[in-house]
Structures are given as C-alpha cells and as structure tokens.
Swiss-Prot record:
Source organism (scientific name): Saccharomyces cerevisiae (strain ATCC 204508 / S288c) (Baker's yeast)
Listed name of the protein: Putative uncharacterized protein YLR463C
Highest rank taxon of the organism: Eukaryota
Additional notes on this entry: Partially overlaps YLR462W and YLR464W.
Region span, Disordered: 1-23
Length: 183
C-alpha cells in the first residue's frame, strides 16, 4: 500500500469522460548523479506523464565506509527513495510504503489531498515498492505507479511502471554510478 490522493477541481460529482482517453507516456527528462567527497550519492530522474504531469524520483544513500567493491555500494538501510508529483506549479511529495518518518501532508492550494502521511522508506535492492495512486477528475486519468530497484554488476536498474484506465506501461532505466543512462 502507499499514499493516495485525488485532485478535484469541482464540488460536484465528476462528469463522465469526454473524448479519447489521455495518452499515457513516460520518458526520462534528465538523469543526474552526484557523488560527494564523503561518498554519499544522489540520483534524480524526472519523468513526463501525459502533457502536464511530472514525477521526479530520487535515490540517495551512502556508500559503506568499509566497502571495497561496487557490489556493496548500496548498503541496506542507507538508501531512501523519494518521489514528487508536480501538477502545474504545485508539488506534492509521495513516499513509498514502509515509513520510518511520518509527517502530515501539507495541503496544496486548489488541490484536495487525502488525509495521509508522508512516507520515507528504506529501499533495498530487488524490492518492489508501491508509490502512489493518482486520479484527476477533470481528465478521468488514473495513474498507478510503482518503482522497483535492482542492482546488477555495478548498474542501478530503476523499473518504473505506470498504469492508467486504458494503458499499462513499464519503463526501465538503467543507470551506472556515474549517472549515465545505459540503453
């Protein structure tokens, strides 16, 4: 399970869908990797969904002090996954299930956000995390997204799955430790 919210632009019940269903697509806008002198690192991937929705997903962690091989770069308990959904100029943080830090949601102006909590979760390699369920009552678009983090021979594999009412799509992004996308 994960956090969920609905953006409702009207006080009445939503109207039935009009016209063709919105096209759901996801592609990487940018992949950034920063490794500081203390060997902490940060990956940022921005995905564009449809025409107006963006999801930015980040991985941050710290390399084990006694690590001597790239296979132990991801130390369990030291890697966090954070996602944000941007709707226009509003940004709503989304955290996977498995929180060890919980704070109340800050309501965004004009958006109806459910009474849920921020969730910050430890991401362990080869583990799948449910991120969020999103519904736009204007376009009748429902997006269910999840993220799966894997580690293989020094390569970070982010498998991100998006699902709408009419389409299911899975996007894999393989990133090495220099932040380069591997096709």
């Amino acid at each position: 399970m994960g956090s969920s919210f609905v953006i409702d632009r009207s006080s009445s019940s939503p109207a039935p869908p009009r016209g063709p269903a919105p096209k759901l697509s996801a592609h990487a806008r940018k992949i950034i990797c920063k490794i500081s002198p203390n060997r902490s690192f940060l990956f940022i991937i921005s995905l564009h969904i449809c025409e107006k929705y963006f999801i930015s997903m980040g991985l941050r962690g710290h390399r084990s002090r006694f690590s001597r091989s790239v296979s132990t770069f991801f130390s369990p308990g030291k890697l966090a996954c954070i996602a944000h959904l941007r709707v226009g100029c509003q940004i709503v943080p989304i955290f996977p299930y498995g929180a060890f830090l919980k704070t109340p949601y800050n309501r965004c102006a004009g958006n109806k956000v459910s009474e849920s909590t921020h969730r910050r979760a430890v991401v362990r390699p080869s583990t799948r995390y449910f991120v969020t369920t999103f519904q736009d009552t204007e376009t009748q678009l429902i997006i269910v997204s999840s993220v799966e983090v894997k580690k293989r021979k020094g390569i970070v594999i982010l498998s991100i799955e998006f699902q709408s009412m009419h389409l299911k799509q899975r996007v894999d992004h393989q990133v090495d430790f220099l932040g380069n996308k591997i096709l």
